Amino acid sequence: MKEFIRSQWMKAMRSLAAAEATLDTDPDSAASRAYYAAFHGVTATLAGRGMEFTKHTAVRAALHRDLIQSGALSAHLGRDYDFLLDLRETADYGGVAEASLASATKAIEKARAILAALQPLLPDGAV
């Protein structure tokens, strides 16, 4: 299980780095990568608690149920995750709607904050 947790956490770090690298040239990609940074970070954290999911909606539900409602994470981080998910859907599937530079910048900041809050929740030695 630690290998899976480590893999997911490293994907989170790579996604955050990709978001930062593409911000100025492609805000849509940056917004999408920021969401995936948070998604993989949450997936790693939930796996550390013995939970695995295959759907984005299941990860979101578990985040709110098992990490937010339990008090392990602040409620504002749940709202931030929802913001990232909504923006990713706009960036990836919005047609003429796009993520702005400002919203993509905000997404990166929120993803970074989520990952910072998640890291202490990971099992010892997992990353």
Regions found by a protein language model. Give the residues of each.
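Terminal alpha-helical segments
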Residues: 1-127
